Amino acid sequence: MLFCDDSKKYLKEQNINLKNEFDKDDKRVEKFSLKHQNIYFDYSKNLINNYILKSLLESAEKSSLKDKIKQMFNGAKINSTEHRAVLHTALRDLSSTPLIVDGQDIRQEVTKEKQRVKELVEKVVSGRWRGFSGKKITDIVNIGIGGSDLGPKMVVRALQPYHCTDLKVHFVSNVDADSLLQALHVVDPETTLFIIASKSFSTEETLLNSISAREWLLDHYEDEKAVANHFVAISSKLDKVKEFGIDLEHCYKMWDWVGGRYSLWSSIGMSIAFAIGYDNFEKLLAGAYSVDKYFKETEFSKNIPVIMALLASYYSCTYNSQSQALLPYDERLCYFVDYLQQADMESNGKSVNIAGGTVNYQTGVVLWGGVGTNGQHAFHQLLHQGNIFIPVDFIAIATSHHNYDNHQQALLANCFAQSQALMFGQSYDMVYNELLKSGLNETQAKKLAAHKVIPGNRPSTTILLDELSPYSLGALIALYEHKIFVQGVLWDINSYDQWGVELGKKLGKNILKAMNDDSSDEYQNLDDSTRQLIAKVKNK
């Protein structure tokens, strides 16, 4: 693998000291920052210099990244294990140029489906869609899991100031009944519309929650016909949708060339449109499309997703980083980390290359984090004084939607202070002298100083948005989507399958059978540990 082999040979030997780099180059921020419209990307606090950046960019060229980008946007089946194109970008493409996949112009299909979703949203919002008893819909319950939940839920929360339809949107994902009950406790069966989001219409969690929601509805109405007024589906399995009782006119498409974790731009984003209105949903798509064009057309040295991917891959291959912290300093982005965990870790958590060979380098990392300033009082201690190498992405919003300017200034000051503290830290001498000034004697100061040293020289990137709007959020999400794609290219892995989740599903079905029948083959084939766990549950 060229990228990791090249980087490991010499880049760490540069021994970058961030304080020294800033001291000797007053143009460093200008050199190592980029802008796309209203998004400012400052990567000057990373362990790089001109030589390292040049080397990373050369590795990107060697990986045939330009060709891979063209292949993805043109509909080549880059998801090689499932023989599928990867075209979530087509869902937000505003051009009219035909895009042929398997003999069909998918642009026309996408346009038709968008219109269908728009009509449904407008029908429900206007009150023309009514519940079985004739009442107007007031609540939307989205039942889905993974990409059918994390993306829409994140966007609906992030864009709460743009909610404009008077519809309350709820999300149910976990097979734990508590997830469903939390929603059912606050909605009225006569004014609730359920969205079942499942391509196969057989995902265990989604199907079980949907069946229970259907039973809840029919307990109230006692009439099967009510289902058609209170359920719509997003699925490719029309027979199963019809059997459930949903009018096929209200079944919306999911295509094989859209992966679940990249599907919020599709009909899966219906719940978003119900919350913020279809016009704002289109602005979300437009923001992502602006990044798609920028990503395709911009040279690598000025291309934010490429630089993001190069930095992350550089730290993984050169510093053996196994973790990346994502710290959004905005409460509206409280679900952003959860969303990106799936997008990143399910995409790049692979240990074989595209040809099927075992890789001998590190690929995907653990992505984690949380909103500021909460994290400062929870896990930032590890970032500053722990002995684990953890690169950090800070996300900040320059202006807020509220009028509490003093809160916003404090929030931003804390964000910028954290990145500065990671970079500079505080030395033993600095701490020792401060302790003496505070009144401690020399013995006391020496004893305490070592505990207060913060090493610094820890890399971080700051992404600053002018505002958090549908357009800018769409752009931000797309930046990370393309970063994930570029990393997959650099590591020569398939970022668009997820075989690792299938075994657990299969075994889960077997264990469920075993729990209900200890004479079954499934039970007989269990290991002793699992049998004991089942026995403990049954004996309660």
Swiss-Prot record:
Catalytic activity as recorded in UniProt: alpha-D-glucose 6-phosphate = beta-D-fructose 6-phosphate
Coiled-coil stretches noted in the UniProt entry, renumbered to this chain: none
Single GO BP term: glucose 6-phosphate metabolic process
Main location: cytoplasm
Transmembrane segments: none
The protein's enzyme class: isomerase
Annotated family: Belongs to the GPI family.
The protein, known as: Glucose-6-phosphate isomerase
Species whose genome carries this gene: Francisella tularensis subsp. holarctica (strain LVS)
Gene symbol of the encoding locus: pgi
